[in-house]
Amino acid sequence: MAIRYPMAVGLKKGHPVTKNVTKPKHSRRGGRLTKHSKFVRDMIREVCGFAPYERRAMELLKVSKDKRALKFIKKRVGTHIRAKRKREELSNILAAMRKAAAKKE
């Protein structure tokens, strides 16, 4: 007679096996930021500064015109999602600037 398991039906029924764990495909890693590309982007940002539209958007964010800044950036970058990401990035930069200024004083 076969070995009996506590469950005859349901999710836990049948022969217990160990799951075969596979590594994710290399083609799935696209879009993930590497250390090197982050370093290069930071270096470029330090050397070149901000584009004129980014400076104007930052001015709008400084005076709490978030919606107007989003509409302005969307017009420049093309899509709503990219605009939201850019607005978030610029507001984080402004917060870091404020933090650095407060630390300096």
Swiss-Prot record:
<dbReference type="InterPro" id="IPR038097">
    <property type="entry name" value="Ribosomal_eL36_sf"/>
</dbReference>
<dbReference type="GO" id="GO:0006412">
    <property type="term" value="P:translation"/>
</dbReference>
<dbReference type="GO" id="GO:0005829">
    <property type="term" value="C:cytosol"/>
</dbReference>
<dbReference type="GO" id="GO:0003735">
    <property type="term" value="F:structural constituent of ribosome"/>
</dbReference>
<dbReference type="Pfam" id="PF01158">
    <property type="entry name" value="Ribosomal_L36e"/>
</dbReference>
<dbReference type="GO" id="GO:0005840">
    <property type="term" value="C:ribosome"/>
</dbReference>
<comment type="subunit">
    <text>Component of the large ribosomal subunit.</text>
</comment>
<protein>
    <recommendedName>
        <fullName>Large ribosomal subunit protein eL36</fullName>
    </recommendedName>
</protein>
<keyword id="KW-0689">Ribosomal protein</keyword>
<keyword id="KW-0963">Cytoplasm</keyword>
<keyword id="KW-0687">Ribonucleoprotein</keyword>
<dbReference type="GO" id="GO:1990904">
    <property type="term" value="C:ribonucleoprotein complex"/>
</dbReference>
<feature type="region of interest" description="Disordered">
    <location>
        <begin position="14"/>
        <end position="36"/>
    </location>
</feature>
<dbReference type="InterPro" id="IPR000509">
    <property type="entry name" value="Ribosomal_eL36"/>
</dbReference>
<comment type="similarity">
    <text>Belongs to the eukaryotic ribosomal protein eL36 family.</text>
</comment>
<comment type="function">
    <text>Component of the large ribosomal subunit. The ribosome is a large ribonucleoprotein complex responsible for the synthesis of proteins in the cell.</text>
</comment>
